[in-house]
From Swiss-Prot:
It catalyses: tRNA(Ser) + L-serine + ATP = L-seryl-tRNA(Ser) + AMP + diphosphate + H(+); tRNA(Sec) + L-serine + ATP = L-seryl-tRNA(Sec) + AMP + diphosphate + H(+). This is Serine--tRNA ligase. Catalyzes the attachment of serine to tRNA(Ser). Is also able to aminoacylate tRNA(Sec) with serine, to form the misacylated tRNA L-seryl-tRNA(Sec), which will be further converted into selenocysteinyl-tRNA(Sec). Homodimer. The tRNA molecule binds across the dimer. Belongs to the class-II aminoacyl-tRNA synthetase family. Type-1 seryl-tRNA synthetase subfamily. The keyword Methyltransferase does not apply. One of its GO terms (cellular component) is cytoplasm. It comes from Blochmanniella floridana. It holds the Pfam family tRNA-synt_2b. GO terms for molecular function: ATP binding; serine-tRNA ligase activity. The gene is serS.
Amino acid sequence: MLDTNLLFNHFEWVAKKLARKNFVLNFDELNQYNDLRKILQKKIEKLQIDRKNLSKTIILAKSQQINLQSLQKQARLLNQKLILIKSEIRTLKSKIKQYQLSIPNIPDDEIPNGFKDQDNIEIMRWGKVHKYDFKLLDHITLGKLIGGIDLSSASKITGTRFIILKGEIAYLHRALSQFMIDIHIQNHGYIEYYLPYLINVESLYGSGQLPKFYDDLFHTQSVVSVNSSKCSTYTLIPTAEVPLVNIMRSVTVHKNELPIKMVAHTPCFRLEAGTYGYRAHGLIRTHQFDKVELVQVVHPDQSVQALEEITNHAEKILQLLELPYRKMLLCAGNISFTSCKTYDLEVWLPARNEYCEISSCSNIRDFQSRRINARFKDGINKRSKLLHTLNASGVAVGRALVAILENYQLENGCIKIPEVLSPYMNGMTHIHYQNK
C-alpha cells in the first residue's frame, strides 16, 4: 500500500509513475472521498468543541441549581450527532483504504518502460547451451518413458493441470527441494520455516494478493462444528511468500536484528483462469506445484543491494545444477502488483528451444510493510519506521525438474543426475527408461 500523504499530496506524480504499470489512478473518486473526509472531520471537531462548552455550561448550571433538563437534552443530541458522523467517517475511511489497496506499487525509475516481454532487458546469460546430435524429447515424453510422470491418473483423481510423479522422478523432485533448502541455509544464511498451507484473508491483504487476485486463488469453506451454521474460510497459499511476510505482521524489531532471511519449501496453489497453450504443457503451469521461497526483511537503506543478493542466491542454485539460464530485468508493465523492481531468471529448455521463467526476484520496498505494519527501531529515534521486504523463488522445483530432464537427457536412454544431487539420491548417477 502506498503512503497516504504521498498519494494525496503528490497525486499527479504518483499517477504518472503508475501509468508505467498501465494503471489509471482515478483522481475524481479519490479526491471526492478525501474532500468528504475533510468536511466530516471538521464537523466532528466543531461538535467536540460544542460538547466541551456545553459540559462547562452544565457544570456551571449545577452550581447555580438551574434546571438541567434542557441542557442534558442538548448534550444527548450532540452525542448522537457525533456517533452518527463518526460512523460515516469510518465508512468513508474504509472506502478510501479499499481504493488504496487496489493501487499497485510504484515502479523504480531505472527499470525500462513497456508492457511486453520484448521490452524486458537481458542482463546476462550463464552456462553453455548444449547442441545435441540426437532427437530431443520433451519432459513429458521422457517422464512417461521412465514411468515417472502420470497425467491421466492425476486428471482422473482431480482434473486437468494436475500431475502425479512417482518412482525415481518423484525421488529426483524431492532431492531437488532438499538440495535447494540446504544451500540457502548453509551457504546463504537463511532460517528454514515450516508453514501453514491455509491462510486467512488478513494475510492475503497483507502480502498484496488481495483485493486484485481473488479469482486466481483456491478458497475453502468449512463448517466450524456440526451444530453450527458458521463457516471458516481459508485460502490455499499461492506462494510461501504470503505466510513468510505475514510472520512480520504487527512486529517491531531492533535494527540490529536485520536482515531477517527466511526460506520455506511448500506446495503452491493457483487457479489462474485462462489458457496458455503449449506454455502450460506438462509441469510448466499446473494448479499445484512446489517452490522454494526466499524472503528478506531489511533496513530501507539496504533493499537495493538486497535485491542483487537474493537474486544471486537463486542464481547459485541454477549454477550448481549446471543449468543454462538468462537474467532479465523486467519492464514496468511486466512487474507484479507489489513489486517496484524485478529480475526474472529463465532456464533453458532444449526441447522447446527457448528460455522459461524459473525464478522471479523482487524488491517490494515498504509496500507490504505498510499493509502489515512491520517496523523497526534504531535505538536513537523513539518513532519506529517501516521495514522493506524482498522475495525470490529459490527456485521453482517442478520447472527445475523439467530443466534437468531435458538438459541431462542422453542418447542411450538415460537421464544423467546432476552431480550435486547424487548425494541426495543415495549415490544414484542415472535414471533409466523402463524398457532399458
